[in-house]
Amino acid sequence: MEKVLNLALKQCEEAEVFSYTSEEIPVEFESNRLKNIESSQSTVIALRIIRNGRIGYGAATNLEDAEKLVAMAVETSQFGMKARFELPAPQQYLDVKTYDPAVEKVTIEEMVQLGQELVDAVTGASSEIMCDAGVSRASGSVTIINSKGLNATYHSSLFSMGIGGTLIRGTDMLFVGDGKYSSHPVRSGKEIIENVLRQLDWAKEQAKIASGTVPVIFTPHGVGNALIAPLTSAFSGRMVLEGASPLKDKLGESLFSPSLTITDNATEDYEAASAPFDDEGVAVRSTPLINQGVVENFYYDLHTAALAGTQSTGNGNRSGGGLPSPGINALVIGEGDTSFDEMIADIKEGLIIDQLMGGEQGNILGGDFSGNVLLGYKIENGKIVGRVKNTMIHGNVYQLLKDVAAIGSDGRWVGSSIYAPSIYCHKISVASE
């Protein structure tokens, strides 16, 4: 990496070399049977330069041809955007624990057993269901060096497991599933199994819900499906700068329910998305986006922060080794004190949304979302009475989250980077056949 940096500095004012290496072993089940076990390794080397005030970029999968990588960055700098920022100097990072060596010690046999237990438990509850499952362990490292003297590295581990099932009866298709991610080994699938069996139990009966406006409970999965995309895009520093965010002039204003607090926080030990620094070498931090209903911060990388006249929030994220852009690290929605059962008991007639298909349709930047309810349940007189079919919902995230009835005490990680409780809202528009 130092060779690439030194070669680049002969032709530019500033330079940065980013390296990401990973090794993953996934165990895959398909149609209730073990299908595949494989090991994969990947490396990405990315060079970003500032030459004649413009940004150049090149990427490779190894360091064997440093001259070619530098030439690529120099060539692209002729057409690159103007660099309004400076690369970060060495700085203090929080001691965020991201690596557990125990992950790499989990044997393939143990992983196969965990996956088989998931499949056996779900098919044992429903002999007709077809399941795909996966158990994976991975480790990796990120290194960034730059011309300001920054030289930073961290190692990470990730263990994940999950299952998805499809139950087909005639023209009726039921989809269920759950998963878990951690920087520690996951030794048991009990929680996943319980969640999927609960989905199957609630879906045994079918129930019709009339078109109109009804109260709605979004489960943690439902929150992730329906509400997160409009919110995260609106808080992006890039969208704010482009004038596309409806929140662009709203800092300090109370636009949401006072019960709602949302933070971008990748500083917690051993969480799957945690890290000491972002993909530009800037220290990550806990950034409140919404604090008790008040719009408090936007998130930035170096480039957008410079354009906005502020500091990076440590949200410079790369996709596949590409140029950094503002991105959420780990979105944490604060829990409330209402149980899921208490929410259900409060509703005479309403809807539970667990999985939404096509939730990112509509004017996302305006907060709109709509989609088909892939997995949802009807509530009657404080009880779940069955699964709804052929039902669509549409709403606006700003209106919904301003009129919150309760926030659940049942927070959990949904995927690797969203922590969400259930959210009970007073009304949503429903269209049912």
Q: Model-derived features: where do they sit?
A:
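N-terminal small-residue-enriched
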Residues: 1-433
